[in-house]
Each structure stands twice: as structure tokens, then as C-alpha cells.
Amino acid sequence: MLHNTTDNVENNQTIKASTFDSEAFLRVVTEQAGVYRMYDSKQVVIYVGKAKQLKKRLASYFRKDVGSVKTQVLVKQIAAIEVTVTHTEGEALILENNYIKKYQPKYNILLRDDKSYPYLLITAHKHPKLGLHRGGKKVKGEYFGPFPTVGAVWESLRLMQKIFPIRQCEDSYYRARSRPCLQHQLGRCSAPCVDKISVDDYKEQVNLAKLFLQGKSSAVIEQLVARMELASNELHFELAAKYRDQIVTLRKVQQQQHVSGHVAELDVVGLYRDKTQVCIHLLFIRQHKILGSKSYFPTVPSESSDSEILQAFIAQHYLSNEMLSHGKVQSSIPKEIVIKESIEQVVELARLLSEQAEYDVKISTNTRSERAQYLKLAGTNAHTALVTRNSHKESMQARFVALNEVFELENGIQRIECFDISHTMGQQTVASNVVFNQEGPLKTDYRRYNVFGITPGDDYAAMAFALNKRYGKLKANPIKPEEHGALEKLPDIVFIDGGKGQLAKAEEFFSQLALTRTPLLVGVAKGESRKPGLETLILAGSHQLISLPATSPALHLVQHIRDESHRFAITGHRAKRQKVSKKSRLESIEGIGAKKRQSLLTFLGGLQEVMQADITALAKVPGISHVLAEKIHNALHDK
């Protein structure tokens, strides 16, 4: 049966059958350009491809002389094919990339690390804010980056504060100011919130900051020198001194920056592969120096060529069909991408990247001089990263094997989850759920739960809450939990950080699920001195106690998982506690309602300023009497 749907953008055609009839499909499939998705009998997308002529490309899969083993295996699993017609080949390339990201088909080259890079963002505000941004570019403003790490962004922000007095505070803090904050006193902000600088002068500093972030520090100095001379000629000596200080700081920065050569802005893509794995190492060259680097380990079908891998990486890493309606990105795509060999669609990819970046983007292969050296360095780093990863993986796999020797699970151990509870005197309770597989921590599957609706301090109830959050969906389909998706997959082992009571609560919970396969539940009890190496494992059911030698790889794995669970829980708890404490200090004072609390924060400029204020300053706040000011001061200083 042929199903057609048409809208203004694309045209979909689908044939579905228990046994795929390729002849019937090829008789009706279009010859236009587009993207095709192949499904198996479970309606799972197993491959996504694109073609200038869909009919011709799809017919090639069903010839008798298909040479590729991968293609032969793929064709045997096809139960349905869906095609999407596009207007151009470039549109097909973008759509293919997005479908691959969405469906993660097992026969495609997959770049699984889709974590967004951090950017510096200058917001589109009357008084723009300079700050770190990560995630979708939904905030209006100009984005500068990407940066390889968050640390690199913070380093840049600290540097920017020394040169340009642009605010870095949140808009809510900015709106609440009635007097300059500490950053203004330190010379790091011009206090636009309280009109210490005109809109035009602030805009001037913002524009200079943008030039600096574009790598044009010499142009910034030229403008500052001109303005310093103008201010001096007009006898505005204080303003001239400020420009002079900016120039001095900028010159120091220029001297400190190591210029590695004549290459200003490019990404260098290194590749190394062994028999089963591939590593791609990306070097970021910005403002004539190596800004940072990152390694990727894509999932690659065994017969894929280096050229195919590089093309898939460039498409998945750089291309996006999400046109930025709110923000303008500066340098998110470099002006040049260097790779070690040519790729089939180099012209089309370069055109699409140029269109997306709004400037010319070049993809270079035959490189010499500095670019060749960078490419060699990227390849060396890819090799090193793969060797390091394999060493870590071998160590982790050995620990999994050692742990299975302890528990003797028939099908081995593939996935382990661990739960921990963190709170302070029963308040701000947070539960963590960390996941490990044979490659180590699976951080994309980590979950943290804010626990509520229980008696404060009841760790057993908190554990039941967390288990229900994690596995509660399985109650709807206890027969086949694996059909709930990756995040609902049952682990082979569930570690419970705690003693017999916590373990009993977990046993009670899982007994209610009536699953066809229940994970092995194990309590991890700390020794009397709580020193590492003295942990005792408690098996569910028999509650048998197992103590492993301090040198045991199995124990090291348990400690690693337990420590990671504890770290993840306590990090969340501390953040929650800090957030609550900021509010609770004033809320706990009798006679201070919402209006007076807001008056204090707005008039004085925030909680820190309220705590630092003396009784006289507190009494100046509208609605706060001298008696109440004294009461507030005493409460905040525990008198």
C-alpha cells in the first residue's frame, strides 16, 4: 500500500509489509532528490540515506550483485522504506543529518557526542549582558565561540572583565539594583543598572568587546587611542585616564598571547582507527593559537572508508536546519576546516556551511606548512586518545568480569545502576541514579530526583521515591521492559548505597513490578570506620554478607560506582540547599513578609548587601522601622 502526504516542504512515500516487496516499491517510488529511511520488522529505523535520484539509489540495494557485506545484511532486515522528497540536494543533506541524529540508526556512522559547546553571549538588551551560554540559541544576542570547555569560557569572561566594564549579572539582579554593586567598586562593571554610564557610552564598550572577541584587538586599541586623545584635547582627563588604563591592559594581553603562526581561524579534523574503533580529534585554532581540542568516538560500520567517516562527521557536527531566528552566531563554524583526504560532497558541504555561517567556509585537504603540521598533531592526538580509551575500557571490562565472578550472573553484567540519598537533617533531600556500562559511566543516563511528600529524614521512603521515579513506568508493561526505550532498560545489577533497611525497601518495590527479569539487588554498607576497602555487600533475598579484599578489581568497581553516585547526589543537594538558604534567612524572621522582604532586597541590592548592612542602613529601607531593623540585624547575625 502506498501512502502519500504532501505539504509545502516535503513529500513522504511509505510502503510497509511483513515481507518487503522491493519490486512493488520501486515501481512507484519517485525519481526526485530526497532522503530515505529504512525500517526493520519492529519499525525501528536501521538506516538513513540521501540521493539525487531516489529511485535509482534505492534500486541499487536490491540488485543481485550487491558487493558490500554490510549492504547485504542491511537489505535482509528491511521491512519498510519511507522517503522524503526535498527541493534540493543540499536540503536532503541537512535532512539526512537531522534524521541520523534523531533515530541513531545502527547502520549509519553515528557521532553520539551531541553535547552543545559553550559560547560567550552578548545579549540584545538596552544594557547588554556578557555571559556564558550553552544549549539552544534561543536568547536574542550575538554568540561567540564555540569554546572547547566551560573553563575556557570562564577564563575569557575574567579577562573581559579586566578590559571592558560590561555587566555579567543576571537580568533579575540587574533590575533589582538601586545602588552600584561590588563589581562596580572593583572597576569591573560600569553600573548601567543605576545609570552610572550613558546608553551610548555603554554601547561603545559593548562594540569594542565584540571587536575583541572577533580577534581584532589591534583595531580596539586604535579606537581607544583615538578616544583617549579626543578626551584629553577636550580636557576630560578622568575619561582619558580610563581609556589609557584599557589600552595598557589590552597591550599586556597581546604580549601574553602566544601567536603560533599566520593561521587565524580553522578547525583541524584528525582521524585514527584500529580494527574496530575510530577516533576523531578536533583542534580549534582561533586568533592564531590553539584554543582547545576534543575527541569523538563515533559508531562506525566496519566497511566505512575514512572519507565516508569524515564526511559524516562534518555534516553531523556542523550542519543544522535550525536557522537562528533570535541569535546571531559569531564563528560557530570556522572559516576553514582541514581534513586529511577529500570527501565526495565537499563542494555541497562547503556551500551549505557558508550559507549557514553567512560567510565563506572552505574545506581543505591538500595541506602544507602549518596546516599540515596541525593535521599531523590532530592525528597524533586521535591515536593517543584511542589508546587511552582502550586502556580505560580494558580496565573497566576486567572489573566487570571480576564482579561477575563474585555474583555469577548467567548472562554476564552489561549495565549497573546505583542509588544514593543526600540531605541535611532531612531537608532538601535529593536522590541520585548513576549508570555504568562496560565502558564506564554512562552520564547521558544519569538522573537526579528532588524528593518530596515524605517524612523529613526518612531515607527508606526517599529510596522508594527514587526507585518509583526510575522504574515506575515499567508497571504499565511488566512483560517486556526493554520496549520502553534506552532509559527504561533494566540493569543487571542495582546497587543501593545503604544497609539492610534500604535494601529491603528496594526488594519490596521490585516485588510489586512482577517483571520477567528482576535485577540483582545489592546493598553497599560502609564499614564501621567508613574507610574505603571496608565496604560490605548485602545480597537481596538471603541478605548474605560479602566482603571483598581491598585489592579486588570487583571492589574497586563497586567503590567507583558508589562514589560517583554519592558525588552526583551531594552536588545536587548542595545546589538545592544553597538556593533555599538564600531565601530562608529573611523568610524565617518574624514580621518580615513578602513585601518587606522584597523592599529590603530591592533597596539594598540583594541578600549579600542586606546581610552586610548595619542597623542604620536597614532602617532607611521604606517600611522598615528602627526596631524592625535591629531585629533583622540581630537575626541575620545570630545575636
From Swiss-Prot:
Pfam families: GIY-YIG (PF01541), HHH_5 (PF14520), UVR (PF02151), UvrC_RNaseH (PF22920), UvrC_RNaseH_dom (PF08459). Keywords: Cytoplasm, DNA damage, DNA excision, DNA repair, Excision nuclease, SOS response. One of its GO terms (biological process) is SOS response. Residues 218-253 form the UVR domain. The UvrABC repair system catalyzes the recognition and processing of DNA lesions. UvrC both incises the 5' and 3' sides of the lesion. The N-terminal half is responsible for the 3' incision and the C-terminal half is responsible for the 5' incision. Belongs to the UvrC family. PANTHER family: UVRABC SYSTEM PROTEIN C (PTHR30562:SF1), UVRC/OXIDOREDUCTASE (PTHR30562). NCBIfam families: PRK00558.1-5, uvrC. This is UvrABC system protein C. It comes from Colwellia psychrerythraea (strain 34H / ATCC BAA-681) (Vibrio psychroerythus). The gene is uvrC.
